[in-house]
Amino acid sequence: NAIFAFPGVQSYHPNPEPWFAENEGGPVIDMGPYYLTALVNLLGPAKQVQGRCTKVFEEREIGIGPKKGEMFKVQTPTTYLATIQFENDCIIQITLSFDVVSHQRNHIELYGNKGSIIVPDPNMFGGSAFVSVTAGGNWGEHKTDMMPLGKINIKSQSSRANESPTNANYRGVGLSE
């Protein structure tokens, strides 16, 4: 399973309208490439995709900057749910949403017949992976901070919820492969 879900870019970006413009794809265009690239790198090519989408709010309020408090029209779906079947017959459910206030799910968690893995945030391309190969879920941490693209490189908090001085941020590296 894979999930990207939060309230939307209007909470931290002073000009969020392009993410919500007609035919711009909302969270699919914003975050989908990071998640889908990680899944393809882990599981191989997809052979079938089924999906649904919806728009929850007709308008949103800008939460920061000189236009703070202004309303703008939402012209694209803001929540997408898909099932992806890969060539190796793995089946993944993915949620990409700008409509979730809060959640505690892992970004990507994969289950197999020999174990499970929790993959670090594909948006930042850094952080530990957690693996369980025993019944009952004893999870082992596999740190990546000693790997070339796992070293912590954030000097100070940028006010984004997913960035902190304790994680690596090599955003876009996965996409460039």
Tell me the role of every PLM-derived stretch.
Residues 1, 81-83, 91-95, 109:
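Beta-strand secondary-structure signal
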Residues 1-73:
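Predominantly a Rossmann-like dinucleotide-binding segment in NAD(P)-dependent oxidoreductases
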Residues 3-8, 53-58, 88-90, 98-100, ...:
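Glycine-rich beta-alpha junction loops
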Residues 10-12, 59-61, 92-94, 104, ...:
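Short acidic, gly/pro-rich beta-turn/loop elements at beta-sheet edges
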Residues 45-51, 91-93, 116-120:
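Acidic/polar loop patches that form or flank catalytic/metal-binding clefts of enzymes
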Residues 58-75, 81, 85-86, 106-109, ...:
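C-terminal glycine/acidic-rich active-site capping loop/insertion
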Residues 95-103, 169-170:
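Glycine-rich phosphate/pyrophosphate-binding beta-alpha loops
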